[in-house]
Design a protein with these regions (language model features):
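Tandem CBS (Cystathionine beta-synthase) repeat/Bateman regulatory domains
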Residues: 1-169
Length: 169
């Protein structure tokens, strides 16, 4: 006869028992098969600094949108953070360029007209789990990191994925 060992006292209970017959511990869910992956979620509790995020590319709100797109292309980056007096006021991503600019006659104009205003932000002391949650809930691929309202980095879905792959070995 097969049974389930209580994780608290080690007593062998009948399969399907919800409570240990020996110590009364809750057994619900302990007989669920575990995932065969070696990933155990350890990275979810890590702070964003573990991602090794580089300094962000920053442009002033009055910068020309075409110049910003050119910088993004030349540097091989997906977004720029937009500031006024050093404080984050928006983000402009490759998606913004494709959706708001591509195929439309865009004269030179300020990036502030096309950026996403007041983006969702993170702090360095927040965890990777918080970043993943904000990305999933908001449908974002880029979230600025700020310190006292000033941008210090950008977390990207690519950063999180790369870190996940590295942690799996």
């Amino acid at each position: 006869m097969s049974g389930m060992r209580c994780p608290t006292c080690g007593f062998k209970n009948l399969l399907g028992s919800d409570v240990c017959d020996n110590c009364g511990s809750d057994l619900a869910g302990h007989d669920t098969p575990q995932s065969p992956t070696t990933f155990r979620g350890q990275l979810l509790g890590e702070h964003l600094d573990a991602l090794g995020i580089a300094a962000p590319e920053i442009v002033d709100a009055g910068a020309d949108v075409n110049d910003a797109i050119g910088r993004m292309h030349d540097k091989g980056i997906d977004c720029v953070l937009v500031t006024e007096d050093g404080r984050l006021v928006g983000i402009f991503t490759d998606r913004d360029a494709v959706v708001k600019v591509a195929g439309k006659p865009v004269a030179a104009g300020p990036i502030a007209d096309l950026m996403t205003r007041d983006p969702v932000v993170l702090r360095h002391d927040e965890t990777i789990a918080v970043a993943i949650n904000k990305m999933a809930v908001g449908g974002f691929r880029h979230i600025p990191i700020v310190e006292d309202g000033r941008p210090t980095g950008v977390v990207t879905a690519r950063d999180v994925f790369r870190h996940l792959v590295e942690s799996l070995g």
